[in-house]
């Protein structure tokens, strides 16, 4: 199960698979793929052995690399060659070198990063400022009020909504729901989460059943089902280092000491 996430540029040198999205769409994998930003959890099946190497693309990176609307192209697994020049060639070259043992996974990742960096074309300055404002707004709490965002931007409410959909894939209200659920799942999966922090997380939802529904919608699992052996990959995906685009959203005195810190935003 793949939780709702930011976009990815991913190489699959070994194995093939398919992703099934909530809209009933099923996309088969390719050697080099664009996994577009997703608005809810999606299931996947693979014929292994299956290896995946790639880049997570923050909203600014997604826009700069692809130029695609994160909303119009959400919830898809697309061949990168349909959108990126030279993708088919570099995908085939890296996959062959990896299968032959001539390049490591880390080296593949660096090669993909260099390929992507050469093709980046950032949006205009005001749009970049809005992306930064939305990101910081999400980090102010687990479920920040939308009115707070509207007061931060230099755009009208409708323009802010439209640009948020373009770069983040969802309107502000839905985006806040997504990151509340993802961060709640990440924090509740932490073995040494303080009781006060757990209570604070619960208070950001209407009640326990609402929290369970929201976490299931965006991660594909309920909080009680993160402990099974079949969820090892899911738990890794929901690790703090893989939710780097926003701060944790907890008050400083409730932050757990296991790396789930709220002391700043990681960039990539």
Residue ranges of each PLM-predicted region?
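CoA-thioester-processing core
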Residues: 175-178
